[in-house]
Amino acid sequence: MPLPRAAFLLGLLLAAAAAESVRETETMDARWLDNVGSGDLPDDEDIGEFTPHLTSDEFDIDDTSGSGDYSDYDDAIYLTTVDTPAISDNYIPGDTERKMEGEKKNTMLDNEIIPDKASPVEANLSNKISMASTANSSIFERTEVLTALIAGGAVGLLFAVFLILLLVYRMKKKDEGSYDLGKKPIYKKAPTNEFYA
């Protein structure tokens, strides 16, 4: 019974994936479908049509290689001009002091951030130890290890206490059932009368 259910769920997932891919192809721009070779769509930055130099009369989809390469039009060069956006004078009022301080300090150099105050340089550089070896010498000095040990010890202690309580409870229950003296026996012993001759 589980195998048909799994097959049904797999089929349902495949149908949903196929429907989603069909939906994605329907959202393509219809004006690009005439001039696209091999699924090559223009970038968002492109200006104008995908192939402005080709008209529907000149372009035959059967003559192309499918790679988007148009061999008949390789020698033609088309230049497009891109309007550069005007640089706006964007500033925050009251932020001029910080801008002026930043220009004076010049803390950025070749994409590297230089601290404002230089760290003091010691005369003997050979005594410096790398940060990897300055880790705590003992594993028990690390806070993560101590936290894990304390939590593990608490859980282990609780487990041991519950185990002992369970054993004591079972022993008491067993003892109560076998040594109960207040119960009357199920059968009565027949009286033995001895007759002396």
Curated annotation (Swiss-Prot):
Keywords: Glycoprotein, Heparan sulfate, Membrane, Proteoglycan, Signal, Transmembrane, Transmembrane helix
Extracellular side: 20-147
Pfam families: Syndecan
Membrane topology note: Single-pass type I membrane protein
Cellular location(s): Membrane
Role of this protein: Cell surface proteoglycan which regulates exosome biogenesis in concert with SDCBP and PDCD6IP.
Protein name as annotated: Syndecan-4
